[in-house]
Amino acid sequence: MSIRIAINGYGRIGRSVVRALYENNRQDEMKVVVINELAEPSAIAHLTQYDSTHGRFPFPVNLQNNLLKIKNDDIHLVRFSELADLPWHEHDIDIVLDCTGIYGSRADADAHIAAGAKKVIFSHPADPDVDATVVYGINHQQLTGDETFISGASCTTNCMVPVIDTLDKHFAIKCGTITTIHSAMNDQPVIDAYHSDLRRTRAASQSIIPVDTKLAAGIERILPKFANKFEAIAVRVPTINVTAMDLSITVSKDVTIQEINDCLLKASETNLKDILGYTEAPLVSIDFNHDPRSCIIDGTQTRVSDGNLVKLLVWCDNEWGFANRLLDTSFYLANLAEQKRLQSTETVKSLEDTGISNEIKDELQDRRKII
């Protein structure tokens, strides 16, 4: 089964998703068949092929008659500003990855479904009535396949939750604070310019700029036991990619640096392999560019004060790691849904073979259509 994906919004995350799909050779599992982006097709092709952060695309990229051609695949390029106009029916879309950063409500998800998509995954935090907010590696196994409206949380939530969850299971976290040291983003100007947030009127390359963050709320949504137990602040720094997370937690018993690091190292080699990483190499932020993991612990920076106050430095590629998790979640969800569909089909066939009444048979077929 090859999952048919549409991307709505082809910015940093959308392009990273396409690149990750091809770099990881997952085209047999998933295919991006259509991209909705208001930019000119020539610019779309150019920015797919040439990327200042991740380098040149590893395969030829060509543009022909509004088709983005990569390897043997044709990706349709469309330009619609209204969700109601999107051609998902026409392209038989299984999952829409909405990477606009704009939409996130139940009504927005319903608009995608009405346009013909079976499921919607937002690449950013969504409204509280979302069917599920998923941090892959932590709670993705709670999905049933029935969900239609999902959020992939945020890059920073995906970075922090595996670390917090792991340490809580071993040392019982009481509370914590986080400082996100995030690379500049495209909502910041190159030189001073107008913005509703006065701090973001300032040149991205000239200052460390405090910005708002909802990271604490994101952690609470995945790990409800930590309601009102975490606070977070964020600053943007003059780099183009990779984020550092300064995590401080109070645990319920005295611990040592070695115990903390051993716990995280073990997780990186077992249940969170390829999600959480661990290193003691003398690395800097650029060394984590294009790292597909959600978070990487720098064990040399772990500190313990007064026995139970723990500080950690955690890295993540806020583009590449997150894009890989979106693909992981898409594949997992679509396969769950397909398994349910097949089970429903087998049930109806079995009942037909046993001569079940047409009334019950019709009811089961109606349920199958809903699934």
UniProtKB/Swiss-Prot annotation:
Detail which positions bind NAD(+).
Answer: 12-13, 318
> Which residues act catalytically here?
155
Activates thiol group during catalysis, annotated site positions: 182
Which keywords does this Swiss-Prot/TrEMBL entry list? Cytoplasm, NAD, Oxidoreductase, Pyridoxine biosynthesis
The GO terms describing molecular function are:
erythrose-4-phosphate dehydrogenase activity; NAD binding
Is-annotated flag, keyword 4Fe-4S?
no
Q: What is its EC number?
A: 1.2.1.72
Q: Name one GO cellular component term.
A: cytoplasm
- Which superkingdom does the taxonomy of this entry point to? Bacteria
What pathway is it annotated to?
Cofactor biosynthesis; pyridoxine 5'-phosphate biosynthesis; pyridoxine 5'-phosphate from D-erythrose 4-phosphate: step 1/5
Record GO biological process: pyridoxal phosphate biosynthetic process; pyridoxine biosynthetic process
- Any idea where this protein resides? Cytoplasm
Which transformation does this protein catalyse, written as a reaction?
Answer: D-erythrose 4-phosphate + NAD(+) + H2O = 4-phospho-D-erythronate + NADH + 2 H(+)
Q: Where does substrate bind?
A: 154-156, 200, 213-214, 236
Q: Which Gene3D superfamilies match?
A: Dihydrodipicolinate Reductase, domain 2, NAD(P)-binding Rossmann-like Domain
Subunit comment: Homotetramer.
| The protein's role, per its UniProt record | Catalyzes the NAD-dependent conversion of D-erythrose 4-phosphate to 4-phosphoerythronate.
PANTHER family per record: GLYCERALDEHYDE-3-PHOSPHATE DEHYDROGENASE 2
Q: So what family is this one in?
A: Belongs to the glyceraldehyde-3-phosphate dehydrogenase family. Epd subfamily.
The protein in question is named D-erythrose-4-phosphate dehydrogenase
User: What organism does this protein naturally occur in?
Assistant: Psychromonas ingrahamii (strain DSM 17664 / CCUG 51855 / 37)
Lineage of the organism: Bacteria, Pseudomonadati, Pseudomonadota, Gammaproteobacteria, Alteromonadales
